[in-house]
Regions:
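Cofactor-binding active-site loop characterized by glycine-rich and histidine/acidic residues
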Residues: 16, 23, 31-35, 50-234, ...
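N-terminal capping segment at the start of a domain
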Residues: 27-43, 245
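Active-site nucleophile and cofactor-binding loops and adjacent substrate-binding regions
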Residues: 41-53, 84-90, 133-136, 147, ...
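A glycine- and small-aliphatic-rich helix-loop capping segment at beta-alpha/alpha-beta transitions
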Residues: 100-105, 197-202, 224-236, 327-334, ...
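A glycine-rich helix N-cap at a beta->alpha junction
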Residues: 104-117, 131, 232-243, 275, ...
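N-terminal leader/propeptide and maturation segments of large enzyme subunits in energy/redox metabolism
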Residues: 112-115, 119-121, 125, 349, ...
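Thiamine diphosphate
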Residues: 133, 137-178, 187-191, 201-211, ...
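Non-catalytic terminal/interface segments that mediate subunit docking, oligomerization
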Residues: 400-590, 677-712, 718-728, 773, ...
């Protein structure tokens, strides 16, 4: 299909009827509720949530036939619901407020009729009582009412069902329909392309779709900018629809006329998105329901053969108020708008708040309690006034059939979500639990397997080599494509890779059994083409793994994904991954596993220059709660498969493990002869730490040497005969993964590296002295270890051998370092004993 450069701008006037008055009422209630949240909590955001409200209300209530969301408030995390992303996370009050109103409407109708269609589990819903939890922690809320003698007060009876929910200052994916942790600006929206691509990959019909809300300042952020390329590269088409709130206002400045001087008239959002190939719609007034609904309808009716992603850019007012007239609040004066309205900075029951409330009172003939008597100092009385006035807003549900309409609307929308959707994969099975992926079942010999493309009917043979013979020249990176191939062979093409234009270089290119993904021409391809966009690539990977097509929340039916680049550049991926880890920790349903490949890591990346060294950079992958990620650092080809599949075996069964990071170096080395090791197990890496050389019996012991990294370990192994000849009796332990080691039986851990060994330990590593391979090393470990930052300086660059020597990780430096460590054995232990003895001496003032 031929596509024009420019798309439809400013959709035609809506000719299809919709319940505009109902939307406006719910919208005004939402605005008033979110202002009450800020007034009584005295924190939060103000102008942005108000600006988003018409978008939010329309998307949730007009229905899928008009381009709104298909979802079930009673089952908001149903996999086949459309995905709503409040990516501008600080605008959370608009969603909290709307969900409270919806939850109240359903609870009201259920109590009135007893009809189970209206029942929503209080643990799922957000209810008016949860307003008290706005920007509060769960611990503080547990006894809040009891501490103020309000636990039996009728105003707060709703809390008896399940307490008060904590509503975070920035929205999270656990919240009702929201499917993004909208924290750092631009980070959340960047995952939208991956979420949309997931449903294309799974072969879903036009729904589920993704509707994401964001603002112009956040879309200037780097991750969000990379989304432009990501979404077009994956050809997600109308499945992705962004609603942009363009009010030219940030936190403390305007964009045009502030950050960008007004004279640069060519800086136009519409042109920016159009130039990236997107299908762009514009709204003169993004706070007008007619224009919003007409745009949603135009998006819905668009030709699905057009694979351009969609964005609607609507001019909005930050600080929008439904009853404002020409920039003024009737009876008060100038409306608080633009960036000064960003935070909720109004004093409790301030004149401006009262003016807003008055317009609501006059419009609906209601009256708020106590707001004209100034701030409420007493905490108990504040909560009473807060809940009383919230109930004033909710009382509108009892008027003019509004509550009945809203409850019926939510039930009707919910009933459009079905438990069966035709998909390309069997969603009753989690392929990552297949026994062939267990370490014990990995084939040791090279495999030649026949794979069939069930869409095209094509067949071919694929060679997979998870293990190699001793002496073969193959570095750890060479094994990466093999583990991915085995994954895709076993899981029927459910392991996706996205690399920053480095797919071949970091050895993920050939992991795809059927080549490059294309939603139409090659939907079973698992290699997603990607630009040099580390942030965007990992965000897309997160979008992919954050979805599941299983109706059973405890059963996973989705994909795993890997994003990779040079180890030195992987910190660009950290913030999205951190936010993902938080989302995964609290998810109510099983999700996939994000993989980070730190390729070309360590000082071995010498020829490219020190800008490309992954020495300090890769250590960010340890900056997660313990047990929620597994980091793997490989030195030998035959460590990769057992180490990785041990991690995969855990992650597939432990929902807390949401990230596996792999660190490999560039050079090829001879595959190690494990017959010469103390631990001859070919799959020893699965245990995290394993013994290369044990203490020689009957001789004085000189300590433990922990080895990590490629050149460091290879060069250390080369020196073992020389060390033995010199009478140096050390135990050499390979450190692949502390996280895997932590999961081994106590007896194994004691045998390999008992706790006391940490006080008699040195490290030989291509990493740094800032982050050790294991925790709790002894006080003298740093003084004797060999690391790439031994002199606290950045290394220079040059040939690989030059830089390894500069890092003091060449064979001679390693021998000398271990020799010194061994010779000082008695002295080292004596110094530590003296330190402990000093603590036992009497201390006098």
């Amino acid at each position: 299909m031929g596509l024009t450069t420019h798309s439809l701008l400013s959709p035609e006037h809506l000719k299809v009827p919709y319940d505009r008055e109902r939307l406006e009422d719910v919208g005004f209630m939402t605005c008033m509720t979110l202002v009450l949240l800020g007034n009584y909590a005295q924190t939060g955001h103000f102008g942005g949530p108000l600006a988003y409200t018409p978008y939010n209300v329309a998307a949730h209530l007009v229905g899928p036939e008009l381009g709104g969301l298909r979802y079930d408030y009673r089952r908001p995390k149903h996999p086949y619901s459309d995905k709503f992303m409040l990516a501008g996370g600080h605008n959370a009050p608009t969603s909290y407020a709307l969900w409270m109103i919806m939850g109240q409407a359903l609870e009201r109708q259920y109590k009135a009729t007893g009809d189970p269609r209206y029942f929503v589990d209080p643990k799922v819903a957000i209810l008016p009582i949860d307003a008290l939890g706005f920007r509060r922690g769960a611990g503080a809320l547990k006894n809040l009412l009891q501490n103020l003698s309000l636990d039996n007060h009728p105003l707060f009876a709703q809390a008896k069902a399940r307490g008060i929910k904590a509503l975070a200052g920035h929205i999270e994916s656990t919240d009702v329909t929201n499917d993004v942790n909208g924290g750092p600006s631009g980070i959340g929206i960047a995952t939208a392309a991956g979420k949309a691509a997931f449903w294309d990959f799974m072969g879903a019909p036009s729904s589920p779709k993704v509707i994401a809300l964001e603002g112009e300042f956040a879309l200037a952020e780097g991750h969000a900018q990379e989304l432009k390329t990501q979404a077009l590269a994956m050809q997600v088409g109308k499945r992705l629809r962004i609603l942009l709130s363009d009010n030219n206002a940030g936190i403390d400045d305007v964009l045009i006329g502030g950050v960008i001087a007004a004279k640069y008239t060519a800086y136009r959002l519409v042109d920016q998105w159009t130039s990236y190939g997107w299908n762009v719609f514009t709204l003169d007034n993004g706070n007008d329901y007619d224009q919003i609904v007409s745009t949603l309808k135009a998006m819905e009716d668009w030709d699905p053969r057009d694979r351009r992603p969609m964005i609607a850019i609507g001019k909005t007012t930050k600080g929008y108020w439904p009853r404002a007239v020409e920039g003024k609040i009737p009876g008060y004066g100038p409306q608080l708008v633009s960036y000064p309205s960003h935070p909720y900075a109004l004093k409790m029951n301030s004149d401006y708040f009262v003016a807003l409330a008055r317009t609501f009172e006059e419009h609906y003939g209601v009256e708020f309690s106590g707001i004209r008597q100034g701030p409420v100092a007493d905490p108990r009385e504040r909560l009473i006034q807060f809940k009383t006035n919230l109930d004033v807003v909710m009382s509108l549900l009892d008027r003019n059939g509004l509550g009945d309409w809203l409850a019926d609307r939510l039930v009707a929308l919910g009933d459009t979500v079905k438990d069966e959707v035709p998909l390309r994969f069997d969603v009753k099975i989690d392929p990552f639990l297949d026994g062939r992926l267990r370490v014990a079942n990995l084939p040791v010999e090279p495999q030649k397997v026949t794979v069939a493309n069930r869409l095209s009917g094509a067949e071919k043979q694929v060679a997979i080599t998870l293990f190699r013979k001793p002496g073969e020249m193959a570095g750890t990176r060479r094994a990466v494509s093999e583990i991915i191939k085995w994954m895709n062979y076993v899981t029927d093409n459910r392991f996706i890779t996205l690399a920053a234009d480095l797919s071949e270089s970091i050895n993920v290119e050939h992991g795809s059994l059927w080549g490059h993904y294309d939603p139409e021409a090659n939907p079973l391809g698992t290699r997603f083409k990607a630009a040099i966009q580390e942030a965007g690539n990992v965000s897309t990977a997160i979008g992919l793994v954050s979805q599941s097509a299983s109706v059973d929340p405890n059963q996973f039916a989705g994909v795993w994904a890997l994003s990779g680049t040079y180890g030195a550049f992987t910190p660009l991926m950290y913030t999205p991954a951190r936010v993902w880890s938080q989302q995964n920790q609290d998810s109510r349903f099983r999700m996939g596993v994000l993989h980070i490949l730190a390729g070309h890591s360590g000082p071995e990346t010498a020829a490219d220059g020190r800008t490309h060294f992954g020495i300090f950079a890769t250590q960010v992958w340890k900056l997660f709660p313990r047990g929620q990620t597994i980091h793997l650092n490989f030195w030998d080809y035959n460590d990769v498969a057992p180490g990785y599949f041990a991690a995969a075996e855990i992650a597939a069964r432990d929902p807390k493990v949401g990230i596996i990071s792999l660190e490999v170096a560039r050079p090829d080395f001879p595959v190690a002869d494990r017959a010469q090791f103390a631990d001859t197990d070919l799959k020893a890496a699965a245990k995290g730490l394993y013994v290369i050389r044990d203490f020689a019996a009957g001789q004085p012991r000189h300590g433990y040497v922990l080895a990590q990294g490629s050149s460091s370990t290879v060069n250390l192994v080369k020196q073992l005969p020389r060390l033995e000849a010199a009478g140096i009796n050390v135990k050499v332990v390979s450190a692949i993964s502390e996280e895997l080691f932590d999961r081994q039986p106590e007896a194994y851990r004691q045998a390999v590296l008992p706790p006391e060994a940490r006080y008699d330990l040195m490290v030989v590593s291509t990493g740094t002295r800032r982050v050790w391979p294991i925790r709790d090393v002894g006080p003298l470990t740093d003084a004797y270890s060999l690391t790439s930052d031994w002199d606290n300086q950045w290394l220079t660059s040059g040939l690989e051998a030059d830089v390894i020597a500069e890092a003091h990780l060449d064979p001679e430096s390693i021998f000398a370092g271990i020799q010194r460590f061994a010779q000082d054995h008695r002295q080292r232990l004596a110094r530590q004993r003296d330190m402990l003895a000093a603590l036992e001496l009497p201390i006098y003032d």
